[in-house]
């Protein structure tokens, strides 16, 4: 491939936009634009979209996306997987007043976790290298690579060359596969749970909300995936801080000692605060992981600071004001 790239670069100009040339083996007289290589049997096609799982390189040749995903890419996929999980859990929490016993509520929580785990596992297994828990992908350098349809080159200001394909393979398409499998899992597992265990004992609003929310998340991904890819750590930070403050504000203004006792003796408080702390840690790790600075992991020490600050400033604040604004 390297010899082919060097040879092609000396006789052909680079393709425009995200277009690339595909390596052809054999006689393709109608599609071949370059001369044959020294081997005499390999040629390059005209400029056009690369195949699924390929992207253009610096020489405008379509190369296979066989580079292992970077840690930041995996954290983005984890963020995408956590969104429906946390959202569906929130739907169950809102419908708690319709639940007769905690047993039914816990059973639906477990069902939601199982649905998302199944969707994540299947989505990862069907992408190359297939049937492994590893993913290969293309290198990414710019937000424009998430929107190739907006950068199709125009020839003579009249003709548009269509070079739309998944430049950021597999981060764009795997999300749609995950959401599609998730809808199937919800329809099968949640329906089975309702028919077998929760028949006439539980409200179906979390089920319908989950079914509607997944397509909405898919539409948001289709439009804002590039923006979310570069900003999701900050979304996590802001979202987890807001959730923590809002949850603690529900307790109102209490003495510090009483507030600590209520939090320490309430499983709901402990679980919710643990989740927000994990999300806050996740956001901090996603920010510092790509940085090449000494002692970067020491920034994790700031994770408990917002909680400590809130508890220390309760005597000087009025949480009920937050509730009225919400």
From Swiss-Prot:
Residues 1-71, 130-166, 291-296 are lumenal. It is a multi-pass membrane protein. Its main location: endoplasmic reticulum. One of its GO terms (molecular function) is ubiquitin protein ligase binding. Residues 93-108, 188-208, 251-269, 318-326 are cytoplasmic. Glycans are attached at residue 27. GO terms for cellular component: endoplasmic reticulum membrane. Signal peptide: none annotated. InterPro entries: JAMP. GO terms for biological process: ERAD pathway; response to unfolded protein. The chain crosses the membrane at residues 72-92, 109-129, 167-187, 209-229, 230-250, 270-290, 297-317. Keywords: Endoplasmic reticulum, Glycoprotein, Membrane, Transmembrane, Transmembrane helix, Unfolded protein response. It is found in: Endoplasmic reticulum membrane. Facilitates degradation of misfolded endoplasmic reticulum (ER) proteins through the recruitment of components of the proteasome and endoplasmic reticulum-associated degradation (ERAD) system. Involved in ER stress response. This is JNK1/MAPK8-associated membrane protein homolog. It comes from Caenorhabditis elegans. The gene is jamp-1.
């Amino acid at each position: 491939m390297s010899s082919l790239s060097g040879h092609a670069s000396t006789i052909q100009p680079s393709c425009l936009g995200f277009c690339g040339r595909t390596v052809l083996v054999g006689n393709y007289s109608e599609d071949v634009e370059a001369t044959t290589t020294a081997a005499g049997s390999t040629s390059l096609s005209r400029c056009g979209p690369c195949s699924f799982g390929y992207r253009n390189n610096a020489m405008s040749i379509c190369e296979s996306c066989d580079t292992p995903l970077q840690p930041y890419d995996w954290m983005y996929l984890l963020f995408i997987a956590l969104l429906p999980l946390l959202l569906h859990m929130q739907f169950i929490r809102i419908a708690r007043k319709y639940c007769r016993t905690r047993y039914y509520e816990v059973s639906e929580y477990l069902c939601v976790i199982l649905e998302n785990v199944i969707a994540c596992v299947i989505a990862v297994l069907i992408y190359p290298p297939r049937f492994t828990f590893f993913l290969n992908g293309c290198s990414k350098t710019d937000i424009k690579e998430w929107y190739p349809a907006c950068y199709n080159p125009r020839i003579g200001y009249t003709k548009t060359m269509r070079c739309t394909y998944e430049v950021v393979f597999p981060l764009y398409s795997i999300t749609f596969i995950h959401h599609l499998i998730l809808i199937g899992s919800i329809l099968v597992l949640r329906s089975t749970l309702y028919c077998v265990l929760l028949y006439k004992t539980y409200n179906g609003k979390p089920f319908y909300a989950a079914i509607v929310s997944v397509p909405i998340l898919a539409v948001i991904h289709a439009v804002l995936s590039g923006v979310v890819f570069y900003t999701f750590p900050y979304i996590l930070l802001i979202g987890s801080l807001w959730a923590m403050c809002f949850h603690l504000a529900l307790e109102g203004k209490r003495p510090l000692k009483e507030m600590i006792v209520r939090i320490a003796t309430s499983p709901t408080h402990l679980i919710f605060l643990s989740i927000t702390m994990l999300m806050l840690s996740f956001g901090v790790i996603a920010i510092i992981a790509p940085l090449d600075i000494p002692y970067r992991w020491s920034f994790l020490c700031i994770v408990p600071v917002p909680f400590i600050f809130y508890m220390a400033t309760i005597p000087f604040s009025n949480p009920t004001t937050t509730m009225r604004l919400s």
